Amino acid sequence: MKFTIQKDRLVESVQDVLKAVSSRTTIPILTGIKIVASDDGVSFTGSDSDISIESFIPKEEGDKEIVTIEQPGSIVLQARFFSEIVKKLPMATVEIEVQNQYLTIIRSGKAEFNLNGLDADEYPHLPQIEEHHAIQIPTDLLKNLIRQTVFAVSTSETRPILTGVNWKVEQSELLCTATDSHRLALRKAKLDIPEDRSYNVVIPGKSLTELSKILDDNQELVDIVITETQVLFKAKNVLFFSRLLDGNYPDTTSLIPQDSKTEIIVNTKEFLQAIDRASLLAREGRNNVVKLSAKPAESIEISSNSPEIGKVVEAIVADQIEGEELNISFSPKYMLDALKVLEGAEIRVSFTGAMRPFLIRTPNDETIVQLILPVRTY
């Protein structure tokens, strides 16, 4: 195998597939990156058997030549060393050549590295997925769906199913749900698919986070193929495979209150900054909570009290307060996480009592809902 490639594209592809490579793997060859040079271009693959990423660099794009292939072939190189080497090479082009016994030479300018490679035939095959019935979602929408839900997945392995995001497709609508049983994030999106197609799968939160880092912010369509055990995301020149989590995701529809006793509408930025300030003292206290008091026709008060340190009280003018008087305590971290993913100058918070879950939404937008469980402080 021998080819010459543009360094910037090489670095980009290697960084993408590196996201799937784990140093803690039971299969030693998976600590490497598989490189295959063919007549069409060069592909790079990284995998930890849960996530597999393949990045393809075509020979040319438009009229610009990116790769020159002198001899097709394949090799597996140690990911950690290879990724560091290509980043630090001096020139704009890199030549990679495999000689006898899988010895690989990497040249750029006057720098030359010799790396011991492994036989690419020993590398596990990527999952074979039949690509009929793909769902298509614009890249920017897909990134939003992930960003607005994945932060709420559980980080604890006690209920593994909650470490993933539930993707449910029915009646041409996708519903993404994530919860760690203290909070819940929900996002809906319309899909351009037949109404009778339905799916209900749980994608690991880690997979979605890594996928989001690889995708560019553009409107190009991503093809999504869902099977019994795997999901494949096909973007431009990138294939991203992830295993699905086993088990049934809990039904969360009953958690969402249908009516409310107190409703407030406030400026998102002012509310977020006030919670952020109150959390400065809450962080130190044992009971990491912020208290919100709302009186109709008056303002909202945000406070936090840490006996060892002191206390903070701040009043915010609400655009609207309706319903009953309310005192409620909650985790400032959960509230900040939810506020950061809502897009809009104002937010509507609906409470159904001091010990009941409450909802945070943007007025006039039903596609995204954040739910938080309050904290008992007595």
Swiss-Prot record:
- UniProt main location, coarse: cytoplasm
Q: What's a GO biological-process term for it?
A: DNA strand elongation involved in DNA replication
Q: Which GO terms describe its cellular component?
A: cytoplasm; DNA polymerase III complex; nucleoid
Entry keyword set: Cytoplasm, DNA replication, DNA-binding, DNA-directed DNA polymerase, Nucleotidyltransferase, Transferase
| This protein's record includes keyword Transferase | yes
- UniProt xrefs under Pfam families: DNA_pol3_beta, DNA_pol3_beta_2, DNA_pol3_beta_3
Q: Which Gene Ontology MF annotations are present?
A: 3'-5' exonuclease activity; DNA binding; DNA-directed DNA polymerase activity
Query: Where does the source fall among the domains of life?
Result: Bacteria
Question: Where found in the cell?
Answer: Cytoplasm, Nucleoid
Q: Which NCBIfam families does the record cross-reference, listed alphabetically?
A: dnan
What family, per the record? Belongs to the beta sliding clamp family.
How it assembles, according to the record, is: Forms a ring-shaped head-to-tail homodimer around DNA which binds and tethers DNA polymerases and other proteins to the DNA. The DNA replisome complex has a single clamp-loading complex (3 tau and 1 each of delta, delta', psi and chi subunits) which binds 3 Pol III cores (1 core on the leading strand and 2 on the lagging strand) each with a beta sliding clamp dimer. Additional proteins in the replisome are other copies of gamma, psi and chi, Ssb, DNA helicase and RNA primase. Interacts with YabA, and via YabA, with DnaA. During sporulation probably interacts with SirA.
What job does the chain carry out? Confers DNA tethering and processivity to DNA polymerases and other proteins. Acts as a clamp, forming a ring around DNA (a reaction catalyzed by the clamp-loading complex) which diffuses in an ATP-independent manner freely and bidirectionally along dsDNA. Initially characterized for its ability to contact the catalytic subunit of DNA polymerase III (Pol III), a complex, multichain enzyme responsible for most of the replicative synthesis in bacteria; Pol III exhibits 3'-5' exonuclease proofreading activity.
Q: What is this protein called?
A: Beta sliding clamp
Task: List the taxonomic lineage.
Answer: Bacteria, Bacillati, Bacillota, Bacilli, Bacillales
